[in-house]
């Protein structure tokens, strides 16, 4: 019997993170989800993942804290033996026009969206290197490629993830570790529900609909499990927006 792969997903208790967890679970992966919430709030996500017939585990810690990440990743390895797949999905927005943006708005977004990817990847990739295999997916955004008014902090953090992805792909390709990014466009989540006039956004999307969490999850599953020769890519999943 083939040993199950184990996937770690940050920000995995809801939204895109949970959708990706479920997609990987349906493909037979055991799932470790991280979030900043407590175990009680994460339990519905754990139950939903377990219903796919796999094991699911929850670890609550701040992904932007280097020490907390190292402690918890070491604990995961001790308890589960390995991490085959890492999805750096944790992220926040603190939008505002640049002239009105203050330092806390800037720093909080960079810390959660970009610094966390460094912290978690730094802890996990050491084990992947020893195993000489692994798949890392960073959840970027279409605005990391093209920018967006009112999102200087968010756009910068997501652009940083693309550079981070390409650099690690070059550094770790010889160790059979693939590193890619996914760049969602407008996806039906609680975050985009706050945007207001969706019809205006739909005018710019050739496919004339918002994306779904499942649209993103299928690409993540492809990068994690279905390809062995794709690395260093930032794949836009945006219905043709920006072409």
Regions found by a protein language model. Give the residues of each.
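Conserved glycine-rich cofactor-binding loop
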Residues: 13-15
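Substrate-binding pocket helix/loop in short-chain dehydrogenase/reductase
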Residues: 97-98, 105-110, 201
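C-terminal substrate-recognition "lid" of short-chain dehydrogenase/reductases
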Residues: 118, 212-237, 242
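Active-site helix of classical SDR
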Residues: 121, 157, 165
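Alpha-helical segment proximal to the catalytic Tyr-Lys
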Residues: 126, 170-174
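Residue(s) in the substrate-gating loop at a strand-loop-helix junction
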Residues: 141
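Short, small/polar-rich loop/turn modules that mediate ligand/substrate recognition or access, typified
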Residues: 173, 178, 230-232
């Amino acid at each position: 019997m083939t040993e199950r792969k184990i996937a770690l997903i940050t920000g995995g208790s809801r939204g895109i993170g949970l959708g990706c967890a479920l997609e990987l679970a349906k493909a037979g992966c055991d799932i470790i989800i991280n979030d900043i919430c407590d175990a009680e709030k994460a339990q519905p996500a754990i139950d939903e993942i377990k219903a796919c017939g796999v094991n699911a585990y929850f670890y609550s810690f701040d992904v932007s804290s280097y020490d907390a990440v190292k402690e918890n990743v070491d604990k995961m390895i001790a308890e589960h033996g390995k991490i085959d797949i890492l999805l750096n999905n944790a992220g926040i927005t603190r939008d505002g026009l640049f002239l009105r943006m203050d330092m806390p708005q800037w720093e909080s977004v960079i810390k959660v969206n970009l610094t966390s990817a460094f912290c978690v990847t730094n802890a996990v990739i050491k084990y992947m290197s020893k195993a000489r295999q692994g798949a890392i997916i960073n959840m970027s955004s279409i605005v990391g490629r093209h920018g967006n008014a009112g999102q200087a902090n968010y756009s910068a953090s997501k652009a940083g993830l693309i550079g981070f992805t390409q650099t690690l792909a070059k550094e770790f390709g010889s160790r059979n570790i693939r590193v890619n990014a996914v760049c969602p466009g407008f996806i039906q989540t609680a975050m985009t529900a706050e945007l207001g006039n969706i019809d205006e956004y739909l005018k710019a999307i050739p496919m004339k609909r918002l994306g779904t969490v499942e649209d993103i999850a299928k690409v993540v599953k492809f990068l994690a499990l279905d390809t062995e020769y794709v690395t260093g890519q930032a794949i836009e999943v945006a219905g043709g927006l920006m072409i």
